[in-house]
Swiss-Prot record:
Pathway noted in the entry: Metabolic intermediate biosynthesis; chorismate biosynthesis; chorismate from D-erythrose 4-phosphate and phosphoenolpyruvate: step 2/7
Co-factor: note: Binds 1 divalent metal cation per subunit. Can use either Co(2+) or Zn(2+).
Cofactor: Co(2+); Zn(2+); NAD(+)
InterPro entries: Dehydroquinate_synthase, DHQ_synth_AroB, DHQ_synth_fam, DHQS/DOIS_N, DHQS_C
Subcellular localization: Cytoplasm
GO biological process, one term: amino acid biosynthetic process
Catalytic activity: 7-phospho-2-dehydro-3-deoxy-D-arabino-heptonate = 3-dehydroquinate + phosphate
Annotated NAD(+) binding sites: 72-77, 106-110, 130-131, 143, 152, 170-173
EC number: 4.2.3.4
Pfam families named among the record's database cross-references: DHQ_synthase (PF01761), DHQS_C (PF24621)
General function of this protein: Catalyzes the conversion of 3-deoxy-D-arabino-heptulosonate 7-phosphate (DAHP) to dehydroquinate (DHQ).
Protein name, UniProt field: 3-dehydroquinate synthase
Native source species: Photobacterium profundum (strain SS9)
Gene: aroB
Length: 359
């Protein structure tokens, strides 16, 4: 088992990574003390697979545990689902000492985290991510949110969990398309922060796709370490943390335009990352060779590298101008400057974006 710490002073928390961790009460004990009431929130896909196991482990800590099962899908990452959680907590007369456990992928983690941040002005929660995307990215760092029809993650809060427990054996039940979606975020870390990791991915992507345990532990651990370091230095995304949004400005536009859930988040980010690489090349920031390597690795990961055929420049810009990184009406993009480094650029000419998007 690997253990990584997110260093945020008195709000620091551990990330535990390994196999068969759901049977280890000690990993939950740092966040859940004896006698506390616990609500495990999951979805209709994950709950039948893992809820009983996780609940039994938490009960071993002498806690009362209940389950709230929600519908599955990005289309349910809404204020309506948030309100459903609130109603469950209020009807159950849960106090401020309740602990919420987010058992599922990124949607569950985001909406449960936002509910934990909001219920009685903040209660403890634990992230138990079950998809590759949530294990390497969304479960770490405290970003919580729900979507709005006009934009993704527009309603939310920064709110850190008390612990993250990552059991990579969950990936055995993950559909291939969902695994590929998670690979988009894995590749992202290599592009923005670690050239050697990118090279390792080029050499080992087939091992990851075959669910090789050693390769998975290394990749998940490396991603979590990079994110933990970034979050520790810039929790509220005022500086370097913005680099974690590589591909996301383009990607969120695809998700919003196509309808949440029709393109998976990682699929949209993959296409967005390729657009960002091509934009960087047009701006003289990135070599053609690096654009080719970035594009090929996404292709090998079974990810899209082009936009939906129904979208054009105008449909992209409509959504991109609502991005949270827009300042004073100016679009700001994360662009790679080489494999292993990136920067936020705010002066990309619209004719360049039009050329890249409509190519």
């Amino acid at each position: 088992m690997e253990r990584i710490n997110v260093n945020l002073g008195d709000r620091s928390y551990p990330i535990s990574i390994g196999a068969e961790l759901f049977n280890t009460p000690a990993l939950f004990a740092s966040a859940i003390s004896a006698g506390r009431r616990v609500v495990v929130v999951s979805n209709e896909t994950v709950a039948p697979l893992y809820a009983a196991q996780v609940m039994a482990t938490i009960r071993a800590l002498e806690c009362e545990v209940s389950l709230l099962e929600l519908p599955d899908g990005e289309q349910y990452k809404t204020l309506e689902t948030f309100n459903q959680i609130m109603t469950f907590l209020l009807q159950g007369n849960y106090g401020r000492d309740v602990v919420m456990v987010a058992l599922g992928g990124g949607v569950i983690g985001d909406v449960v985290g936002f509910a934990a941040a909001s219920y009685q002005r903040g209660v403890d929660f634990v992230q138990v991510p079950t998809t590759l995307l949530s294990q390497v990215d969304s479960s770490v760092g405290g970003k919580t949110a729900v979507n709005h029809p006009l934009g993704k993650n527009m309603i939310g809060a920064f709110y850190q969990p008390k612990a993250v427990v990552i059991d990579n054996q969950c990936l055995k039940t993950l559909p291939a398309r969902e695994f590929a979606s998670g690979m988009a975020e894995v590749i992202k870390y290599g592009i923005i922060a670690d050239y050697e990791f990118f090279v390792w991915l080029e050499q080992n992507i087939e091992k990851l796709q075959a669910l090789d345990n050693e390769a998975l532990c290394y990749a998940i651990g490396r991603c979590c370490q990079i994110k933990a370091d970034v979050v520790a230095s810039d929790e509220k995304e005022s500086g370097v943390r913005a680099l974690l949004n590589l591909g996301h400005t383009f990607g969120h536009a695809i998700e919003a335009e196509m309808g949440y859930g029709n393109w998976l988040h990682g699929e949209a980010v993959a296409a967005g990352t390729v657009f960002a690489a091509k934009t960087a090349h047009e701006q003289g920031l990135l070599s053609e060779e690096d654009v080719i390597r970035i594009t090929r690795l996404h292709e090998r990961a079974q990810l899209p590298i082009s936009k939906p055929t129904s979208m054009d420049y105008d449909s992209f810009i409509k959504h991109m101008m609502r991005d949270k990184k827009v300042l004073s009406g100016q679009l700001r993009l994360v662009l790679p400057t080489s494999i292993g480094t990136a920067e936020v650029v705010s002066d990309v000419p619209h004719d360049v974006l039009r050329r890249v998007i409509n190519a």
